[in-house]
Amino acid sequence: MGYVLQQIALFPNMTVGENISLIPEMKKMDKKKIKETVDRLLKSVDLDPKDYKNRLPEDLSGGEKQRIGILRAIAASPKVLLMDEPFSALDPISKTSLQDLIKKIHDDFKITTVFVTHDMDEALKLADRICVMKDGKVIQIASPTEIINNPENNFVSEFFDNEKRINDEQFS
């Protein structure tokens, strides 16, 4: 399983390339394949490997650091990616860009993603299934459209009340 945390947690003394290749190296993947994977992943998020592979995290913007954290999480091709509020500390422009990136990664790499968020707009945008919990108990699991149109109870209805203005096409 790959994971991306709210705090990016790149190793400051390691280059971008070293950060991304860390897990594949720990799994004893072929060195040539690791290099190819790092380059391919950087290109997939519009970061030129020649420009970024040897940079240190201190030389990156917050959004770039988060992209590298995501790439590190998927570099060893996990079947499941856990993302725990990864964009909560980012500015709106970076957040939107990274949300779009997550959708692209999900589609391109076919990785099941468990995305933890308190941002209902984010849940509606990114999820094909949403699990609403209260006090550690599951209240409803459904598609975004089903959650909006048929909330299980008042808690779910109120939780998503502001989202009712969103057109179904935006989150389907």
Report the location of each language-model feature.
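ABC ATPase "signature
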Residues: 141-142, 150
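Conserved catalytic motifs of ABC-family nucleotide-binding domains
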Residues: 77
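Short helical segment in ABC ATPase nucleotide-binding domains corresponding to the A-loop/adjacent helical element
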Residues: 17-25, 35, 39
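Conserved ABC ATPase signature
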Residues: 55-60, 64
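Catalytic Walker B motif of ABC-type/P-loop ATPase nucleotide-binding domains
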Residues: 81-84
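Conserved ABC ATPase "signature" region
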Residues: 32-51
